[in-house]
Amino acid sequence: MNENEGISLGELETRPFSEGITRFTKEQAAYYAEQKEKDRIKALKIPYEDSKVREYLRRYGEPITYFGEDALARRQRLQQLMIEKSLEGDNPLDVDQGASENIEKETYVQGSHELLVARKKIALYSLEKAKLRLKKEREISEIPVPEIVLSGKSSIEHLQKAELMGSQIGGERPIAIVRFSNNGNHFASGSWGGQVKVWNSDNLSEVQLFRGHTDRVSGLDWYPLCQAWDADSEQLTLATGAADNTVCLWKASQSTPLLRLEGHLARVGRVAFHPSGDYLVSASFDTTWRLWDVHTGVELLMQEGHSEGIFSIACQPDGSLVSSGGNDAIGRIWDLRSGKSIMVLDEHIRQIVAMAWSPNGYQLATSSADDTVKIWDLRKVSLAHTIPAHSSLVSDVRYIESGVNRFIATSGYDGCVKLWNPLNCSLIKSMVGHEEKVMSVDGYGDRFISSGYDRTIKLWYP
């Protein structure tokens, strides 16, 4: 063979892969196959609501239920059926083609004059609030790095000593949500019995009982301009949402609703005040979230955008953005000033059940029934971190500020309350005390409150 001519492909020596490379290749193939299967299942858009699961089974000509079959088993049966149809080449969405077409079609509805005024007010408010936030961030950035590192390390060591310090029966039914007041001296709870209570956070004594809901309370938020609990106050104090399809506004001096906001066609999930105190947002299983004027009770906006019910909703600290999370496993971030959806959060594989904005204004934490917490970065418009937070559904997630330090608190159906370092997503402390699943958590400084299916409210601190 002439050296200048080189060699042909047929003359190349072939050698078998080593055992290590072969094993790695097989593991890679298995991983990609698993991811492909997850993507296939996600693309099927299997409904979560049992009524829709039954409807899909009926359209497939299958029994809508078997003896002893619960909702989860019924959904798994539908999932397997839809996968089989997909593998056979059938389009599983053909059973609901009309609904699919409606989902894909964009529609625009002219807003009211009141909504236009509200958007302008929100724009002006958010610009001023952003200036204050950036000023605070600059002040923190001027602190020497060693001092911040030492402060963070000291705070983590302090939180690692947190223990169960008090427990109280919160009602006759499971306690779905707890939230600290703006100064931390009190907290409020909402139960499946429809009761809303305010408690002293020092001794866990009940100080007020509100009655107005006829079904499970699942959303609760303190009025941002209410700095301290005053039993004689005529000022707006709380907002709650419940499975009776209503949102209620409360003042401390009255045990019945100050205002009842009606309009949702299905159960209401989370509710959140706008930081300005002028507006309230509510999420519902009617697949919409709504914007309300808290002074007049007028519905300013009914926003669609999810294919399944919406449970979680949260306002960004500046007040310019709102995030919503649905049973369709999709989250969306909306610009309240323009009404546009500016980011889609599509990395969860099961429904999103809670959301919390970081005080920095550009990070959002979402928790899901897929057992994870995900941190999203709006600056990069992408997912920043995934925390395998619990071994079961992550029922709540909250950002907690303690001086210049920030932490994340989560609760899960595995019975745990956990604290996390948001800088590296490392676990700081896992606290166990509830007999059954933990349904909610909140924190103020170094104090944490949790509520559970066991009907108890528990207080934790170092």
Curated annotation (Swiss-Prot):
Subcellular location(s) per record: Cytoplasm
Please provide, in alphabetical order, the Gene Ontology terms of the cellular component aspect for this entry.
cytosol; U4/U6 x U5 tri-snRNP complex
Q: Tell me, which GO biological process terms does this entry list?
A: mRNA cis splicing, via spliceosome; mRNA splicing, via spliceosome
Which CDD domains does UniProt cross-reference here? WD40 (cd00200)
Report keywords, A-Z.
Answer: Cytoplasm, Repeat, WD repeat
Give all cystine bridges in this chain. none
Looking up Pfam families in the UniProt record yields: PRP4, WD40
Q: Where is the signal peptide?
A: none
GO molecular function annotation: U4 snRNA binding; U6 snRNA binding
Enumerate the WD repeat regions by residue range. 170-209, 212-260, 263-302, 305-344, 347-386, 389-430, 433-462
For the keyword Protease, the answer is: no
- Identify the Gene3D superfamilies for this entry: Pre-mRNA processing factor 4 domain, YVTN repeat-like/Quinoprotein amine dehydrogenase
Which PROSITE patterns has this protein been placed in?
Answer: WD_REPEATS_1 (PS00678), WD_REPEATS_2 (PS50082), WD_REPEATS_REGION (PS50294)
The protein's name in its UniProt record: Uncharacterized WD repeat-containing protein C227.12
Q: Tell me the organism.
A: Schizosaccharomyces pombe (strain 972 / ATCC 24843) (Fission yeast)
**Highest classification ranks of the organism:** Eukaryota, Fungi, Dikarya, Ascomycota, Taphrinomycotina
